[in-house]
Amino acid sequence: MDATIKVTKPVLKQKDSSAANLVAAIYGLLFVSGEKGLTLAELNRVLRKVGLEKIKAALVQLERKLSLDDESGIEIKKFGHSFRLVTKMEIKDFIHRYLPNKIKNPLNSKTMEVLAIIAYNQPCTRPRINEIRGADSFQIVDDLLEKELIVELGRKDTPGRPFIYEVSPKFYDLFGINSLDELPKVENFDLDKFRQGSFFDSNRYGDD
């Protein structure tokens, strides 16, 4: 007679209704999503039958938990429409030491200039951009569209019916802000620094 005892592993049931499990699930999902992060809509698609209100409440709970935990170097930050896990500013010096070369702005100075013009004047057309710059911006606008940093809103009802542009959610992610209100005020705006990417670095890593 075969005396082998077959051990059956218990089946763990998912408890979508459990607030603790929901917080843990969101934490894990944000972790694996990396720099891309996740929007509420994406979380809602993955966490089926949970509902947006419960997801929002769990996000707030997780955000508060990480924020108040002095032993955690991670927090949740919203970039445009996406939520991401990022390192806290309190440990930025250690991060800099580990990664001595900061992530550099992937945009050149002319592209930064056009992007700044659109951000501060949106909705904005190519003729308006050219007028402000005093130079043609056709190729740069196309590059920004290709990089998905701006989007077309349609055409303006003026002669020539030029396209209208505004910044995209990816713009907010790149500069580490939630809204245009977080951009430097116009009276304090330094276009040269914006061109050089200083604004990009300061918002990603804090002032040195």
Swiss-Prot record:
Q: Which sequence ranges are marked TM in the entry? A: none
* One GO BP: cell division
GO cellular component terms, semicolon-separated = cytoplasm
**Entry superkingdom:** Bacteria
Query: Keywords in UniProt for this one?
Result: Cell cycle, Cell division, Chromosome partition, Cytoplasm
| InterPro entries referenced in this protein's UniProt entry, alphabetically | ScpB_csome_segregation (IPR005234), WH-like_DNA-bd_sf (IPR036388), WH_DNA-bd_sf (IPR036390)
Q: Where in the cell is it found?
A: Cytoplasm
What is the role of this chain? Participates in chromosomal partition during cell division. May act via the formation of a condensin-like complex containing Smc and ScpA that pull DNA away from mid-cell into both cell halves.
On subunit structure and binding partners, the annotation says: Homodimer. Homodimerization may be required to stabilize the binding of ScpA to the Smc head domains. Component of a cohesin-like complex composed of ScpA, ScpB and the Smc homodimer, in which ScpA and ScpB bind to the head domain of Smc. The presence of the three proteins is required for the association of the complex with DNA.
The record's family statement is: Belongs to the ScpB family.
What protein name applies here? Segregation and condensation protein B
